[in-house]
Amino acid sequence: MKMSNMLISTLREVPAEAEIDSHKLMLRAGMIRKMAAGVYNYMPLGLKVLKKVEDIIREEMNAAGAQEFLASAIIPAELWQESGRWDAYGAEMFRLKDRGDRDFCLGPTHEEVFTDIARNEIKSYKQLPLNLYQIQTKYRDERRPRFGVMRSREFVMKDAYSFDKDQGGLDLAYDKMHDAYVKIFNRCGLDAKCVAADSGAIGGSNSAEFMVKSEVGEDDVVFCSECNYAANIEKASSPAEKELKQEFKEINKVETPNTKTIDELVKFFGTNEKKFAKTILFNADGKIVAVMVRGDREINEVKVSNAIGEVINLELASSEDVKKATGAEIGFAGPIGIKVDMLLVDEEVANMYNFIVGANETGYHINNVNYGRDFEGVIGDYRNVTEGEKCPVCGGKVTIARGTEVGHIFKLGTKYSEAMNAKFIDEDGKEKPFIMGCYGIGVTRTMASIIEQHHDENGIVWPLSVAPYHVSVIPVNVKDEEQARIANEIYEKLTSAGIEALLDDRNERAGVKFKDSELMGIPMRITVGKKINDGEIEFKLRDGEMEVIKIEDVYNIIKGEFEKNKIKLK
């Protein structure tokens, strides 16, 4: 491609709306342009990268035995109502009606559609196993779209669904997808780690995320420094701390005027946070649920939702609901005599002795409370893991880092096949529900994550595998006929050899061309200048030093970079 023919306009200044490096650089490099909040147009340069990421995904999915197809983006409400998710999915779903007043949505995800296809097309176990995938635009009405294409309302996703006759088949499909994802992210030059995760709105019994460490990531990820344990904070666990056994003391009601917070209580009682158990009330779709954790812990709302069951909306209870359940103002709730639909007690609280809780009376707390003697509830893990706690696998210390999810794999089991009556005839002639798996990659998010990991002060540093062009050819002076001729010859030779070259034939200063090449992240640069009189040109890797080479050596040097990166020329 010749730059004089390209639709591209780079920006020298950082747009005020851009918060993170990938967003800034995609705008500055002319890869995307904003249409509305969370909605972007992909310009030619950006689309080339997007298609290369898609091609890598497609190649590895095909190699893993999956078949590509394309589902409709507009989905009738009936399918979502069958699965029970029409109401459960919430405000993120774009809903619409046709002229006949029938309900539809723009697909935020496609479990129902794939399940519908399977129940209509697959009749016998002989047609299994099957893995179908698509690469398609998804739509989610994010409350706060931000970070460019990292969290947008419209995004490209690869979603795949496996159908098996038994759990063993699902396990095999899941492992194949895991291995395919490792290859995909490696080929994209992305350092992504597989971590244990919660299944969220998708559902299912088992899931893992592929996370990219990032300071601007939306998730906290727990890593063990001594083994391979890694989990999203929503899923992460750590062995509960247990106090040494003590004699139960007599409970003691204490007046604590204007003392509500843990910090205030620590000062009032002259002790530490670990001697308190705080009781927080939630409204879970109309049910009032109380959750108890130790005074220095934070409640994990995902774990709480999972313990309750199917929850559409979990939020802190209102002051009115707190008053009704406890008879007190917020800040004085406790487990003794509380009137709630469910009391969830973190396992650490159940292993504490003679601790302090709210008295369910404004201005009072109770000391020397013990689980079992004074109250009971549903014991479980309802807290967030914190830095430095013990790893649940090896006992080493865990660290916490921010991360961005680029892929997610689920073992769905029969959640959707049973809800939608999707069945096949097995070897015994009996009907059985499909055992399903679900596997997603955020294609546009992967693209942005690559930039987050591969950039410097001058712009993007694309891995060769996904770069929009492999090499830029820059004549220093396009008005110099000999420079223009040799630059064009090099460009033509590289292009005919399957190397994607970008000839900067614009009548611009060399410095402008160099800056644009670096900003766009082209992996290699060839500069054709006055040294051609000696049969020489300049060669530079995007993140390397400039070197002078012979004109006749240029092809072999570039070919060597492809071999070094294990990329085949097409």
UniProtKB/Swiss-Prot annotation:
**Chief location category:** cytoplasm
Question: Keyword Kinase, does the record have it?
Answer: no
| Name of one Pfam family that matches | tRNA-synt_2b
Q: Which domain of life is it from?
A: Bacteria
Q: Name one GO cellular component term.
A: cytosol
Q: Which GO terms describe its biological process?
A: prolyl-tRNA aminoacylation
The cross-references to SUPFAM superfamilies, in alphabetical order and at most eight, read: Class II aaRS ABD-related, Class II aaRS and biotin synthetases, YbaK/ProRS associated domain
Family assignment?
Belongs to the class-II aminoacyl-tRNA synthetase family. ProS type 1 subfamily.
**UniProt-recorded name of the protein:** Proline--tRNA ligase
Organism expressing this protein natively: Clostridium beijerinckii (strain ATCC 51743 / NCIMB 8052) (Clostridium acetobutylicum)
